[in-house]
Amino acid sequence: MKTNHHGRVKTMVVMILLASVITGLKAAPPAPKKGNIALKSLTSITFNKDGILFLADPLGTHVYAIETQSATQPNPDKLNVANIDEKVAALLGVQVKDAKIVDMAVHPISKEIYLAVTRTGSPAQSLLIKIDHKGNLQPLTLNNVSFYETSLTDVPAPGTKLPKEWHSLNMAVTDMAFIDGELFVAGLSGEQFSSKMRRFVFPFTNQSQAVQLEIFHTSHDTYETHSPIETFLPFPINGQMNILAGYGCSPVAKFSLQDIRSNKQLRGVTLAELGGGNRPVDMIAYKKDGKDYVLIANSDRTMMRMSSEDLDKGKPLTTVVPGAYVNAGVNYLAIAEVGVMQLDDFNDKSFIVIQRNINDGSLNLKTMEKWF
């Protein structure tokens, strides 16, 4: 049967439209699942700006994302929960020594506080706790929830000999951040070049990109590929967006965000040494009087503030520091606050911290004014 010119045109139009529909269907984001999340571990949590909460379960080799409900009452200016460790332990029905707060994140809309908690002993358990505006603690069930999930395919297998004796399988995910539609996940992999940054487009498609990271370690006098990032954030330096990362013992290095996205292996630029025997536990970016700053909480030092101006002028460090506790590189302001174990932004006036009181040993969740 012959087909005239108009018939061929119609056929071509139909085929083009059909191809467009098929392409659109292929590009459609995956729908969330409905069911139970059974965590084997919980080492890191973070939000995106829409209130999606991401949960890292390295022992279960998964990262999950769940929608969270926001509070309707006005956001508080301040929040204080004294003896937070005792309250968490009481909620779990265990002694204080058997409950550990491993991470904290502030809901970007409601300003409610979310805690990642591990209960040790038998059976061990990882769970989420939410703190409302009045300081009340509520355990969150992960049963019958809508969620997204993606696999961590490169984490060290149980029984793997790790590069350092103090490394653990939980360090497969040490920190996470949501940047420009992607979840960045730092930690150890099961590969010889073990320090890694993974990227997952959200909603998850179970596909990821990763780059193996290397830095010059200013306390250890060597280029290291097995030191995991302890904490990191996106931060502009010299007009370009970078990942600013803190390492144990305790260099601070930058990685170009563009280079992270376009390389399989990448050597960062070490900009500062905060002193040996220390671990940066958290860092956040904030503005004060029109200037950009990074605030770093440390395990064995005071809090430290670095300015964007000083980071812009930072020169690469490529030689060992002359002593075990010597600092070097980018200048910082030492803040007279110690014992800060968790740190996040709260509002325009305050941070939220979990801090060990050096006078009585209590562990408290509280707001800290941005006066510096």
Language model segments and positions:
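Sec/Tat signal peptide C-region and signal peptidase I cleavage site
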Residues: 23-27
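Sequence/structural signature of beta-propeller domains
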Residues: 28-372
